């Protein structure tokens, strides 16, 4: 009898925990789902993990950010940023290819806009939730090396930390901004990812 009572109590506690978690996750997950609608990301894949190829990846990054900084700084929306990239994909690819040649390599390169899954990622004072994001992706050579990423719009990766915060605050809703700048939010992101795998 006591055993049955204990089992019932344990089951009740588990159900209560699951329901409480779901009620807290659902609104949080809704805010997470909105963030990709306001963010345009930048993703570079190096040829390999050799020191030389990783150094080349960073040189390509610096060159692309240098050449596009003003335009991304003046974009008024994610759509503006994405349209700029679409209209200039060939130019961006040429910038990348020239930087690769300049450094003594003959790797082919590709610049494209993709909608891809990113895991939960940290960037300076930001944590972005996992999800499907639109991004400018640049691949160098075999694209088998470690990647580099940042946020092109709002232009966090080409700003100082304070400037990036100001731009993010202008673009994101109050709930979204609070979520990505909360340094205690990672556990909730993990719960959301688990929730998405089970129910989505």
Give the ranges of each region predicted by the language model.
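Aromatic-capped interface at the extracytoplasmic side
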Residues: 23-36
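Amphipathic, coiled-coil-like alpha-helical scaffolding segments used for oligomerization/assembly
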Residues: 78-118
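Soluble extracytoplasmic domains of inner/organellar membrane proteins
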Residues: 126-185
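Early exported N-terminus immediately downstream of N-terminal targeting peptides
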Residues: 38-89
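Hydrophobic membrane-insertion alpha-helices, especially the h-region
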Residues: 8-25
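Extracytoplasmic
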Residues: 37-39, 55, 104-108, 131-135, ...
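Soluble periplasmic/extracytoplasmic beta-strand elements of cell-envelope proteins
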Residues: 39-45, 108-112, 135-139, 149-151, ...
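Acidic/histidine-rich
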Residues: 98-101, 109-137, 143
